[in-house]
Amino acid sequence: MRGRPAGWSPTGSRFGILQDARQGAGRDRRRHGGAREGGVTARYVATPQALAEVAGALRREPRLGVDTEAASFHRYRDRIYLVQVSGRTETALIDPLAIADLGPLGALLADPQIEKVFHDADYDLRVLDRDYGFRAARLFDTRIAAQLAGEAAIGLAAVVEKYVGVKLDKEHQKADWSRRPLPPPMLAYAAADTQHLLALRDALEQRLEGLGRLAWANEEFKQLESLRWTGAPAGGASDDESYLRLKGAKGLTPRSLAALRLLHRWRDSVAEREDKAPFRIIGNDALLGVSRALPASPAELGHVRELPPSLARRHGAALLDAVARAKQLPDAQLPRLERRPRPIKDPGFDGRLENLKAARNRIAVELGLDPGVLCGRSSLEAVARARPTNREALKQIPELRPWQIDVLGDAFLEAGSGP
């Protein structure tokens, strides 16, 4: 979620945003107009010297609000294009395209003396690990806190409006953060993502303390510290089996699957060459439609309902070539969806799982929590498989947190005691 303060105006404000006059390549800097929110100033950091200076100032803060901006909606290569870090009185908008060494930022994130506040930290932490190898210590996630507080709407805008009284908009939610220079409205918008996190954190902490759930949240926050990137390296191509995960692929014949595989590879190569998000080359529905129809001529291609005429004209030759090559493949080389064997369940598994789910749902209603927040399905299945008979056995189930055992333990032992 991306937001900016309501009522922001780029003219006549006292908010100073520093930006390199040459978009990060030169030495001279100039100030752009921006916004000032609640006494917090923000500046655009585009040189190693500026980063060292602002990191030194932020190192004196007890806690920092942190967020990142990417451009996966626009670019093939998913990477971080902006990092926002807010203290009590200053926000740094750090440009990783302009600064080769972000070591001072990594040191801030790793400092256990400084609490780092994110909203929905999972992806931010993973991409910070992927792009820079950064690890973050001592975390507070306002999204998790809102979930454990029983909030139904947990987006940043919703919880900031409820707990801080500031209305954020979504104007630049899908903006292209790879563009340079970033205009002042986008910079002010990005700054708002972190400028309200500290106040939101304090309000949610107070709420969780009142509910007796702060310890639950702290357990969840500690788990975040171990998050690492597990996908392809930054800028890496998608894996060769990713076409099988497209919605609708499982319903295709082997011959159509072969066409989809070749079409998907073609789209990926074009997207990489042009550094555009793959869907901006051609959408998934169009790929599936062509694969299903297996057209042999421009006329037949034009009858594919999912393919816009403009894309048929632009990419028709490449699409027909991929289909023709798929038709020429011998049957032995056609892809086939392998059915994964279903795990063998003992006869009483389904009954125990339903009993556990009913117990979980009952307690979730009593606590005013979403059942999935209280205990997810994978954790329920782990308990059903383990068939614990006491709390010590519950503690041996890695999917369960200690706070969940405290809250659900007795009910789980009773519900899972069947055959």
State the predicted function of each range.
Residues 16, 22, 26, 31-64, ...:
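N-terminal accessory regions of nucleic-acid-interacting proteins
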Residues 3-4, 15, 19, 25, ...:
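Accessory DNA-binding and partner-docking regions appended to nucleic-acid-acting proteins
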Residues 65, 74, 82-85:
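Non-catalytic, usually N-terminal nucleic-acid engagement modules in DNA/RNA processing proteins
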Residues 1-29, 38, 110, 139, ...:
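Phosphodiester-processing cores and adjacent nucleic acid-binding clamps
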